[in-house]
UniProtKB/Swiss-Prot annotation:
Positively regulates the activity of the minus-end directed microtubule motor protein dynein. Plays a central role in positioning the mitotic spindle at the bud neck during cell division. Targets cytoplasmic dynein to microtubule plus ends, thereby promoting dynein-mediated microtubule sliding along the bud cortex and consequently the movement of the mitotic spindle to the bud neck. GO terms for molecular function: dynein complex binding. WD repeats lie at residues 125-164, 170-222, 225-265, 268-312, 315-389, 410-449, 474-507. Keywords: Cell cycle, Cell division, Coiled coil, Cytoplasm, Cytoskeleton, Microtubule, Mitosis, Repeat, Transport, WD repeat. InterPro entries: Dynein_regulator_LIS1 (IPR017252), G-protein_beta_WD-40_rep (IPR020472), LIS1_N (IPR037190), WD40/YVTN_repeat-like_dom_sf (IPR015943), WD40_repeat_CS (IPR019775), WD40_repeat_dom_sf (IPR036322), WD40_rpt (IPR001680), WD_LIS1/nudF_dynein_reg (IPR050349). This is Nuclear distribution protein PAC1.
């Protein structure tokens, strides 16, 4: 018994006859006169099919290409159903987290915007794994670095996402990281006029770092000096032309991108250095602080200008793949938990949580790290010893080691990359279980753990990198209006890339 109504069955039968007739008609136009007899036989076949299905051979009152259009509509509806199913699943997770953690709630304000579903998918032309992704500082452009050394650029506004706006053969081996400068860089001065523009850098397993013009995507210079794979790079937030890099050769290097010189090299790990993050000190004379993570299963905080190690974070049981500073406006979510649960941290001085040195001088306090033990860890870093007119010294408390605050558990395989939401409340993590997960720091104080509030599953392979659109240059703000300022500069663009050879744009 058919599941279709008589009217639906009649439409389907007529669409089948129309489809077969169109194929024969299209083929007949390309045949020579002597081959027409075969076509006539095929036309007889159409008449027989129409007679068998009890429908007329004429389809003048039927929509052109009716069967194909019905088929494509079904596929679109299936994709829409899958997206809506994912969204319902995410909303259920949020509701469950709210009930389990004392009513913590995510508002619909722009400041709390979170990605929910894939808006566009950008396939790589070279069919190569995507190792790194980056969003342009102000244009609607997405950039990806691939395992064959290619850089691909897509325009979000283009109707056809399958064709990149530009594809550059950038390196002879895999591109491991792409990073944009935090603000325009003055590369040259011509006829007394400033020539500032955004630049970006790429690093590779071919041992090189390349600096590129952000307007033309043309290569400016090559930085060489590492003796092994260059794992990651980051521009200085306080000095736009300064670039930091880490490598499998165990070193951290500091470069001046305007002339290509390496200004400092230091070794802080005993094995491959995988990733780094940089933050500017609140007291400008201190310069920058660098977080690095390594195959030696440790995270190291260093003073950039001197290379001095300030503290060590030990607790992972496998290679650490990614590390990120938390912004100072994240502190409120964690401070409350530590003050209410001081008995869980007997080695932590009670006054440390409220110590003004973090906010007034250092500009750092908490960080997160992720690794091949499938865990994201939250840390409190002890404050460095600050001296007048001299570089800081290692922390004097807890033997210069950080305090492990909490584990963010849920990933089923290696966690490869981290991203911090501009509002400082949410942490993004992604990895080899094909998922991107969102964690809410505000649930730590209410429920005693950092809860996963979203899980995004659209990649068909490992997720290697995630990136959110950077904020425009910050203005002078007070603590009272910092979130309002961040909200005004947010672009709500989030991308991911992985071994399924695609970049996904999330909405």
């Amino acid at each position: 018994m058919s599941i279709l109504s008589p009217r639906q069955q009649q439409e389907l039968n007529r669409a089948i006859v129309q489809y077969i007739g169109k194929i024969i008609s299209d083929n007949s136009e390309n045949l020579e006169h002597g081959e027409k007899n075969g076509v006539l036989q095929h036309q007889d076949l159409v008449d027989k099919v129409a007679n068998l299905l009890d429908v007329p051979t004429s389809s003048e009152d039927l929509t052109t290409n009716y069967l194909e259009k019905k088929w494509s509509t079904v596929l679109r509806l299936q994709r829409k159903i899958m997206d809506l199913t994912d969204e319902v699943s995410n909303l259920k997770t949020i509701i469950e987290a709210k009930h389990a953690n004392g009513g913590s709630e995510i508002s619909k304000d722009k400041i709390n915007w979170l990605p929910t579903s894939v808006f566009k998918t950008f396939p790589t032309q070279t069919h190569q794994s995507v190792n790194t992704v980056a969003v342009h500082p102000y244009l609607p452009l997405i950039m990806a670095g691939c395992s064959d050394g290619t850089l691909s650029v897509w325009n979000i506004a283009n109707d056809d996402p399958s064709i990149p706006e530009k594809s550059i053969r950038a390196h002879s081996r895999a591109v491991n990281r792409i990073r944009w400068s935090n603000s325009p860089v003055e590369l040259s001065v011509k006829a007394g006029a400033s020539n500032k523009s955004y630049i970006f850098a790429s690093c590779s397993s071919d041992l090189s770092i390349k600096i590129w013009d952000g307007n033309s995507n043309s290569q400016i210079r090559i930085l060489t000096g590492h003796d092994h794979t260059v794992s990651s790079i980051a521009f200085s937030p306080s000095k736009p032309s300064i670039l930091y890099s880490v490598s499998r050769d165990k070193t951290t290097k500091i470069w001046d991108s305007t002339n290509g010189y390496c200004t400092r090299t230091f070794i802080g790990h005993s094995d491959w250095v995988r990733d780094l993050d940089v933050i500017a000190a609140k007291q400008k004379s201190l310069g920058d602080f660098i977080l690095t993570c390594s195959n030696d299963q440790s995270v190291r905080l260093s003073h950039a200008d001197s290379g001095t190690g300030l503290c060590l974070l030990v607790g992972h049981s496998h290679v650490i793949e990614s590390v990120r500073f938390l912004p100072m406006h994240s502190n409120a979510h964690i401070d409350k938990y530590l003050k209410e649960n001081s008995d869980r941290f007997p080695s932590m001085p009670p006054e440390l949580v409220s110590a003004p040195i973090y906010d007034d001088v250092l500009g750092y306090k908490y960080c997160v790290s992720a690794g091949r033990d499938n865990i994201v860890k939250l840390w409190l870093m002890p404050p460095a010893v600050v001296r007048p007119n001299a570089h800081p010294l290692p922390a004097a408390t807890n033997n210069s080691q950080g305090w492990h605050i909490a584990d963010l558990t849920g990933h089923q395989s290696w966690v490869k990359t981290l991203q911090v939401h501009p509002n400082g409340r949410f942490i993004f993590s992604a990895g080899d279980d094909k998922s991107i997960r969102v964690w809410d720091l505000s649930t730590l104080a209410t429920g005693g753990r950092v809860t996963e509030v979203k899980k995004l599953m659209k990649h068909e392979g490992f997720v290697n990198d995630i990136n959110a659109a950077p904020l425009s240059e910050p203005k002078d703000t007070t603590n009272e209006d910092i979130l309002q300022d961040i909200e005004s500069r947010m672009r709500c663009v989030f991308v991911s890339g992985g071994t399924d050879n695609t970049v996904r744009l999330w909405s």
